[in-house]
Design a protein with these regions (language model features):
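Glycine-/proline-rich flexible loop or hinge segments
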Residues: 73-85, 106-112
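Non-catalytic accessory segments adjacent to catalytic cores
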Residues: 88-146
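A short, internal acetyl-CoA/4′-phosphopantetheine-binding micro-motif in the GNAT/acyltransferase core
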Residues: 78-87, 155-156, 258-267, 295
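A structural signal for short, well-ordered beta-strand segments and their strand-loop junctions
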Residues: 108-113, 184-186, 288-290, 320
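A conserved beta-strand-loop-helix scaffold within acyl/acetyltransferase catalytic domains
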Residues: 2-53, 57-70, 114-119, 130-266
Length: 365
């Protein structure tokens, strides 16, 4: 028999300690990540399932957000649940408790995107049998979390890891070292504006969107004190030319954001940054280094193929996740949401592109 509870702040460490050691743990299921999202439009709820001995057996950090116009809530559990996902009795109880919360809060559906490979047919069949609807079957970055990533097994020693890199990757890494690129690892919050300036330069060059600087400040304040976030900066001839942000939780490190200036890209700072982060992950007893998202379209004429080739060079395993699944509580409102949400996102993108175009015109003036 299982029991569920919604936790308050006093039990933050209890929650995190379970998530850290549990199967399918993930930084996006930590208390601090919920706090970060809670600074925006989301409201976090932390649910724990306990057995008769009052020991935790499963957990779920659930984010709730109110939909404009409809006035209803949606639930999202990023990379959740945490626990034995193949224990059907446990999962059945967990989702039944989420249903109760949904009735209380007037939620339309729960979205999950568990840290599970698409090859896990048993879990996919279980979710379908319990009424989950597959959603977000895309090849790019359209989902809430990347569907395709590279993951590097860190259990070999560093010499073996380096030897397994593609020859061109090793060459570029050593080129950066020969050219005198230096990596600053002991970065403080005062270095964050430096990184963000380079990130803005990257977004303008590569034409993708980025969050506001305020969001990065909030991310720093929520995650750095817990030891979950680290900034790396690459310097060449005394000037910052590239940077990365990485997460670390449990036995996994994630490469989250990368940025490079237009100048001096030929000294290959990004390769040395990745190698530095891999060594940092090893020093912190990580077993996995996650390079995060790549496109699922592996055609060489795909504009995102260069990102795939860069990450592939470190000899990680190309991984496709099972994807997003929705557990629908209100079919009528869910139907409205699935039809209106793409239109909403399309108009948001148009507005952003318009603002960028205006910004570009002002610069040319």
């Amino acid at each position: 028999m299982f029991y569920s509870r919604l936790l308050e702040i006093a039990e933050k460490e209890y929650f995190n300690n379970f998530v850290r050691q549990a199967p399918k743990n993930h930084i996006l299921q930590t208390w601090e990540w919920g706090d970060l999202k809670g600074k925006g439009a989301w409201v976090p709820y932390r649910m724990v399932l306990e057995n008769e001995e009052k020991q935790p057996v499963a957990a779920l950090s659930l984010l709730a957000r109110r939909i404009p116009v409809l006035g209803k809530l949606i639930f999202y559990a990023p990379r959740g649940p945490v626990g034995d996902l193949h224990n059907q009795e446990l999962m059945d109880f967990l989702f039944s408790e989420v249903r109760k919360l949904a009735r209380e809060k007037d939620a339309i559906f729960l979205k999950i995107d568990p840290d599970v490979s698409i090859e896990d047919l048993a879990l996919r069949e279980y979710l379908r049998s319990r009424g989950f609807v597959a959603a977000g079957r895309k090849e790019g970055f359209e989902g809430l979390q990347p569907k395709f990533v590279f993951r590097l097994d860190l259990t070999p020693d560093l010499d073996t890891l380096l030897a397994n890199f593609h020859a061109k990757t090793r060459y570029n890494l050593r080129l950066a070292e020969r050219k005198g690129v230096e990596i600053k690892e002991n970065c403080g919050k005062e270095d964050l504006p430096i990184f963000y300036e380079i990130l803005q330069e990257t977004t303008e060059r590569d034409k993708f969107l980025v969050r506001s600087y305020h969001y990065f400040e909030e991310m720093w304040d929520c995650l750095v004190p817990a030891g979950y976030l680290k900034l790396f900066l690459a310097y060449y001839q005394g000037k910052p030319i590239a940077g990365t942000l990485a997460y670390l939780f449990g036995d996994t490190a994630w490469y989250i954001y990368g940025a490079s200036a237009n100048a001096h890209r030929n000294v290959m700072p990004n390769y040395l940054l990745q190698w530095t982060m891999i060594k940092w992950a090893k020093e912190n007893n990580c077993k996995t280094y996650d390079f995060r998202g790549v496109s699922g379209n592996l055609a060489e004429d795909n504009p995102l193929y260069g990102l795939y080739r860069f990450k592939k060079g470190f000899n990680g395993t190309f991984t496709e996740f099972s994807g997003e699944y929705d557990l629908v509580f209100s079919p009528f409102y869910y139907g409205l949401w699935t039809n209106l949400e793409p239109l909403y996102q399309k108009n948001i993108r148009r507005l952003i592109n318009f603002k960028k175009a205006i910004k570009g015109e002002k610069r040319r003036d």
